[in-house]
């Protein structure tokens, strides 16, 4: 489960309740559950002290889980998150290996809440530096339309301070590289604990491709798991056969590659799917301006980029 920093205990408690409600033998005939709950801090936009996540929210999240496309952007635990000073949240992506290498799939889900605007890179293009005027602000200080709609080529009003100057003052903007990111890594490749650790380490390369340098105090976690290696709840034999991929040749390198690419894309999807949000104390975090971003990508020679 993913949530914010001050709701970890509440979510974990609700996961235990949900499990006990659906398994009457748990805690009497068999052991209990150890919930896994990860968090990032959304205090800039959210009234985090209110601890608004409750038992019903957790039950609904578990009961509504299903296959198919995953909702992205400002949803679930990602509702109040900020990525590279744009609105962030939940992003997903996956890669499938060639059939000759097993046809395995690597899936990534990221809850993005990290990075500083000048760091953002998309396909090698310094998007963050080009769009640095789109700063998180307090609505009482700066008029929202000027934040959301102003383009680098838009003429400034007569006698008005440049937008970058007005938005870069400490009382108006977030100017530090702080935050966290949670990456969930799933694969149907049969992996040992060692291999899963190696895959998790490569997720950091995917974050780096978007511009992250893992700032001081940034809590970056990767939780990796492999789906085919399942054990029976109660063992009926002293041993059991277990397959796992070998750590040599093309397969392991293709898995590394898949992790890096999918992690990078998941971060970018969290940005492209999130929209401008007004949070507590009239704070505004702008969504990534997609049209301007696409124009910049084309300007830098990424001619294949187009709006759907």
What annotation goes with each model-predicted range?
Residues 1-308:
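Alpha/propeptide regions of enzymes that mature by internal proteolysis
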